[in-house]
């Protein structure tokens, strides 16, 4: 029976279908047939922690077990009532078996299942634990990614769920209005707030803005079309240079900068920076959007320049952009799996680091790094300037989301280890933070992750 099922899969491939897509389709019954001849493979962290395995209950029935429960629930995912995360994206690999030929023959004649292949992920259990514990209690997401290789070291989303009890709690999960199954790290779309100033700054420099002589006198507010735009808490920043406008996240100055920019050119820039594009990731992801038009009012244009308005971005998209700056302008393709191994530990397939594309010219990436360094040295994230073995770069953001001034809190940045020169991108977003909350939760969470990297 096992040999027959393998032939069915290969017949489908040679008939003109992709066997991978065929098996990964959750509505295809073939994967259920394969599960009768192959015991689904394990999933491991990069440091060999078991993240998912197939166990057998007292009745001899197989079930999927997740030792870390909620901690890896979104990135590893689950099977049963639907499929999510790596369990879904690598369903084909987990239901494939590259066990020894003689073992397959013996299993076929004895009616035993073949052992499925296992995934060795890029996830680091120490970094994942730090990110998970730091996010605890917040809705939002944390991503940590090696900027030079694209290897995702941690991916956490909140609220979380127990993947071991999805089937039993399916009705309750579906009735929950907080979308617990949504992986906010890849699928969440958020108003960027002041982290979008990185793109506004980039566009200003691209269009030949006067970087050296720029000066703006911030009084804490600015009028646009009869509407008042304030800096955070109405704070007056005084006379600010371009560097200090970015470091202190001066809304008024960025409104002033935005007045000089071409809407058409910033549309083109955002398109080049993957807004409105599919992201190069295996997991399901949301598509960011930049909707500013020439016909929009001056007020809408002003809001857009400091990250309010209708612009939306996912944490993974932000991570790709930041990692490109950290990597000299070139984004690496994000990856969650290092390799596939058979039950004897033999490597069947390797997923090496791959360049995705150049998003910033190297000289521009280096220049943007200096601005991001100012945020840490003396700007809005100065409390992250405390790690002996790390050079940290970043941008904070607060995006108002309702009339009560509740907001999403952001931190995007990267840290280079002074001894190893390893470079890690960090993106944090937390949802629905009450007005006046200090310190910003995203910066606090980033700090807890940085402690592990230090």
Language-model regions, residue ranges each:
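Beta-lactam-recognizing serine transpeptidase/beta-lactamase-like catalytic domain environment
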Residues: 47, 148-194, 199-430, 438
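Periplasmic/cell-envelope proteins involved in peptidoglycan metabolism and beta-lactam response
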Residues: 1-170, 180, 189, 214, ...
